[in-house]
UniProtKB/Swiss-Prot annotation:
It is found in: Cytoplasm. Belongs to the MurCDEF family. It comes from Koribacter versatilis (strain Ellin345). GO terms for molecular function: ATP binding; UDP-N-acetylmuramoylalanine-D-glutamate ligase activity. The keyword Metal-binding does not apply. GO terms for cellular component: cytoplasm. It holds the Pfam family Mur_ligase_C. Cell wall formation. Catalyzes the addition of glutamate to the nucleotide precursor UDP-N-acetylmuramoyl-L-alanine (UMA). Its EC number is 6.3.2.9. One of its GO terms (biological process) is cell wall organization. Gene3D superfamilies: Mur ligase, C-terminal domain, Mur-like, catalytic domain, NAD(P)-binding Rossmann-like Domain. It catalyses: UDP-N-acetyl-alpha-D-muramoyl-L-alanine + D-glutamate + ATP = UDP-N-acetyl-alpha-D-muramoyl-L-alanyl-D-glutamate + ADP + phosphate + H(+). This is UDP-N-acetylmuramoylalanine--D-glutamate ligase. Transmembrane segments: none annotated.
Amino acid sequence: MDVRGKRVLVVGLGKSGIASATFLQAQGAKVTVSDSKSEAQLRQEIPLLLDKGITVETGHHGERTFRDQDLIVISPGVPFDQPQLEQARKQGIPVIGEIELAAQFVPGHVIAITGSNGKTTTTSLCGDILQSGGKKTLVGGNIGTPAISFAQLANDDTWSVLEISSFQLETIERFRPEIAAILNITPDHLDRHGTFEKYAAAKERIFENQREHDFAILNADNEPCVEIAKRVKSQVLWFSRQHEVKHGTFVREDKIYFRDPKGEREIMPVADMLLKGAHNVENVLAAVCVGVAASVAPEQIRKAVSQFKAVEHRLEYTATVKGVDYYNDSKATNVDATIKALESFSKGVHLILGGKDKGSPYTVLNDLLHERAKTVYTIGAAAAKIEAEVKGVEVVHAETLENAVKLASQKAVKGDVVLLAPACASFDQFQSYEHRGRIFKELVRKMAEQEKK
């Protein structure tokens, strides 16, 4: 793709939008950026772009801005069916995302990880496994560094390990990961995709451009993944926590094994993992498949996994205050992630739920809440819906995270767990799930400091 002298519009001024705009400008494109946020909301970003000679439009998306372009690059948070984009496509203007842009400019090998839950942990772990195997590795995508930023860092021997969201997969054309994994597919982002079927179809696109010798890694315990495997053109590696598989990873007698036509290899005991929870066993199984597919030796895989700690905001132990353990799982932005968090504790859980609703029912939590939780504290815009649907456990309307932590700390007794696993997006009260998690940790640490006085 040659963008020199081309008029390119970048829509959305998040991390990937800014990275795309600055990269395209450096490549000689005539770049305009457009964001519906106000100039005041973008006061930090705008000067950086103007200094590079990039035209900035804020507060709205002008029809003419979209019309007078040779290429449009959209950020993941921008709806693919936005009217201005629909009109641009009708006019024959290509509309792609930042991941597709990266696919055309970043050299080297690509590993892509998607799924409803576990993406960030697995992507980070895969990066550690490849580094342990002596490979030049870059980790990013939907976490940390936008993939397009790797254009200046990668060469033909580099492995780019990317977390990929369903939003990013909506806009791919040539994006082809040599190794791609779907960890699981459960209801999420239904407010964006409309139906579960459309959401699953977006996830499946990760394999769309793979070739026969590439690898597709899939969860044998997840029905949508099993269905997707029937349509995959590449080599399938399975992972399963529940049963043995012929080609892939599984658990037998609390040990992780990899099996293929050449035979069976023990990788490591499950007890050697630092990660907590059954769902993290699944994440490790998937990451081991990635390591094997990338020709990393079993002992190097074992070393990386045994040293890997929980990623921030993913079932992250925060502190123990008056005998009560506090865990930050702010990344649990859907119901299935909250289920996995609850399954990590046997009883005595004080659960903080709520935020911006994503369209899934909360009734599926009820059996587990009855079994393992003492109290649910609701916060944010979804509070009323949660309070109407959650049964079999005490529910307290807390409104804010600060009040929820306060109420939970007053009610919890020694041996209990206070768990932030909201099952919702964060944007009603916070800038991001990271922001929500940081606030939770600050509140808990203040209590811990008070206890020491």
